[in-house]
Amino acid sequence: MSPTNQVRITLACAALLAATADAAAAQSIARISVSSTGVQGNADSSPPSLTADGHWAVFDSLADDLVPGDTNGCSDIFVRDLWAGTTERVSVAPNGDQSNGGSGLESLSSDGRFVVFASTASNLVLGDTNGRQDVFVLDRITGAIDRVSVSTAGVEADSDCHVSVCVPVISTDGRFVVFDSHATNLVLGDSNGSWDSYLHDRITGTTDFVDRNAAGEQANARSTGASLTPDGRHAVFTSQATNLVGHDVNGLQDVFVRDLSTGVVELVSVSSTGEQGDGISFQGMLTPDGRFVCFGSAATNLVAGDVNGEVDVFVHDRLTGVTELVSVASDGTQGDGRSGEAVISSDGRFVAFDSIASTLVPSDTNATDDVFLHDRLTRGTLRITGGGVQGNGPTDHPTITTEGRRIGFRSGAKNLVPGDTNRATDAFVVDRGAALIASYCVASTTSAGCVPAIGSSGEPSLSGSAPFELRAAPVINRKFGLLSYGFAPSTPPFHAGLACIAAPLERTRPVYSGGNPPPDDCSGALELDFNPIVRSGVDPNLVAGREVFCQFWFRDRASASGAGMSDALTFVIQP
């Protein structure tokens, strides 16, 4: 997956640096900046970039104990096989020599074959004499390394990629690479005296500006943060230029998408009515089809009611024109601190981001950055840490796999995995689990003051005999209820709560809440094992891979509606 534009640790040599509850609990976490034998890195590591299927991860590290023979004293690039548990160093010359300079700012092609990275090393390719940080591509199958930050004529760049903005990205087939550079000699006629975003074609050898307008004119101000869809057709970038589209009148940094096949450029950091942002926008990432783009923005006018005065994360739908705020809690509460570094799943459903806000999930008391995942379908937001643990150090810069199941990030926390004693920033991957169980929506408050929450234990599965227990508590004692389920979410108002499932609905047999004898209190609970329904074959729609949305309904005769509802749960049926 294409990474967000990340502040990586480096390109520096070691000598230059000073020595929701159920959903969260279902997460498993692994520290990946370790050796093939599990030895933890003895220095800082960057956030990982992940392949689409979560098989491979790439990161850079100053650690010298991740592979044998690491004696160059510089940051190197490592690829971790998450399935086999092996780690290899890939920022080496084709003859196996260690690089003689620091390497970083890495990303993987979506299938893991190609690694693109930046390096100050001069011994990775022949003829590297510019003494600059260059961009390279490694083919992990052939072992070949190309330098791609060159002109169409093969001339070396006369300036660097900058460590804080240049995270090069490569298409799946390895043909196209986008990167940022301050060089003036990569394209003829480079006259803006500023940073530009570039596209290099590894088949034809051509290098051109990404930041051109439809008429072919170069951007008249700084452009950075280029990213690319896996097919190489669409690029997204950030620019201060005013000449990329007509009527760019806000005088601020915006996010743009360019169709590289047609040359058409679109300003996407706008409201649903097309209003340009009244604050800077930055760090865009596209879904593979180019439809959805997520980005960060300080603007207050992209959605109605943006009143928190903080940098937020937004998603713009290029098909419908709709822009939505996604750095919010499950109930829509806006963050009380900065959010950013957003990445998006391939279907546009899941957006991961980091935030210092304390209002996005309950009990966020660590006063530092965390990584969150927002589900645009269910509107639920959860904190990504693994096992529900709150990190005791900053956690940031997420990456995401195609379906949103696995989330990578870096963290300085020491309590995310056992045995974290290296006092370094490490790279982690959280697996949310195949079932992807998550709560969403809002429960009604009962006449007795109960707010029933739905939860689960076990896994929804067609095979075996293990249960998948669904439970709503607290509910009013001694009342009958039932579980409704369907295959899409919905949120029309239902008195004090929400009916969270779209029609058509199926209903289970009644269940009894039990609890104390009258009068009414909140001692009841509704429980149902869903797996016998799945395995019975009565509902032909309950097949492996199907996502189910469910919610408990129960009697509450003293309420205005005569009934109450829990919040809702979504899960995917497993084989």
For each predicted feature, which ranges?
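Bacterial N-terminal signal peptides that target proteins for export
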Residues: 2-11
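Conserved "turn/edge" positions that cap or connect secondary-structure elements
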Residues: 24-434
